[in-house]
Amino acid sequence: MATYNYPEFGAGLWHFANYIDRYAVDGYGPALSTIDQINAAKEVGELSYVDLPYPFTPGVTLSEVKDALKDAGLKAIGITPEIYLQKWSRGAFTNPDPAARAAAFELMHESAGIVRELGANYVKVWPGQDGWDYPFQVSHKNLWKLAVDGMRDLAGANPDVKFAIEYKPREPRVKMTWDSAARTLLGIEDIGLDNVGVLLDFGHALYGGESPADSAQLIIDRGRLFGMDVNDNLRGWDDDLVVGTVHMTEIFEFFYVLKINNWQGVWQLDQFPFRENHVEAAQLSIRFLKHIYRALDKLDIPALQAAQEAQNPLQAQRIVQDALLSSITVSE
């Protein structure tokens, strides 16, 4: 039997948190501290990295987080400032209140400091409240200027830290400012700094009507793919389901694009197992990602590229199926 040198796997720490929605306002489980979540991530057994929301839960110190990560054998890949909570319900970068914008910038500067302290790869910027809900609500010119200028100021003040923008079409805003791969790349071009890139969420690309593989290629071609998250959904909402449960072929194409471009990075989960066991959901996800990795090893890439050159979809599918389905016969 072949042995495989699998990639490193990671997860957003929220994978192990408690969730609420607009119906179950009392939550789907007990409140869990940052330390509790790190300990749960440890139970998965095959995670190397976690992305940590910041600030940490009340009462948890940076020193305690460092100790917990060390004890769990985990490292921080990113810090995600929570610039989407109640305080910034009208926006972070684009809030009409200058004081609210200043408070958001302060939190993001603090997050850059945490990245340095933990040796993480980047600050993940997900400005979920930046955008609008109604026609005529905003000046699109002014809103875009606030978003782009704000990112430029933030990244320019922290040139030693990478900032990865995670785009998404909508939710919580009806329309988010950073809503697509193309728009995010245009904004990064306007920003004009090397330390600003993209964190590509597979589910956000699906939900936005994109091909995640196509989006990945677009971003890689411009040297801006700083990180990625995988999950799954039914394309009508950001369901954050367990990866591979719906779009198996498209997730394979996504990782194929990463492979042929020699993109080296953590294979990271961004999932919300509301009703499922959090640890088991992560373990099942990693099991599937290992299947994908083995399938990439089996894939006849020259034959596939010849089929693609001829734009022969049936031949391409035959080659893909031979690799993808045969990889699943190996038990985990």
Swiss-Prot record:
Name of the featured protein: D-apiose isomerase
Family: Belongs to the xylose isomerase family.
Organism, as annotated: Pectobacterium atrosepticum (strain SCRI 1043 / ATCC BAA-672) (Erwinia carotovora subsp. atroseptica)
SUPFAM superfamilies: Xylose isomerase-like
Record text on cofactor binding: Binds 2 magnesium ions per subunit.
Any one of the GO CC terms: cytoplasm
Role this protein plays: Involved in catabolism of D-apiose. Catalyzes isomerization of D-apiose to apulose.
Molecular function, one GO term: xylose isomerase activity
Catalytic activity: aldehydo-D-apiose = apulose
Its EC number(s): 5.3.1.36
GO BP of this protein: carbohydrate metabolic process
One Pfam family linked to the record: AP_endonuc_2
PROSITE patterns, A to Z: XYLOSE_ISOMERASE
Superkingdom as given in the UniProt entry: Bacteria
Keywords per UniProt: Carbohydrate metabolism, Cytoplasm, Isomerase, Magnesium, Metal-binding
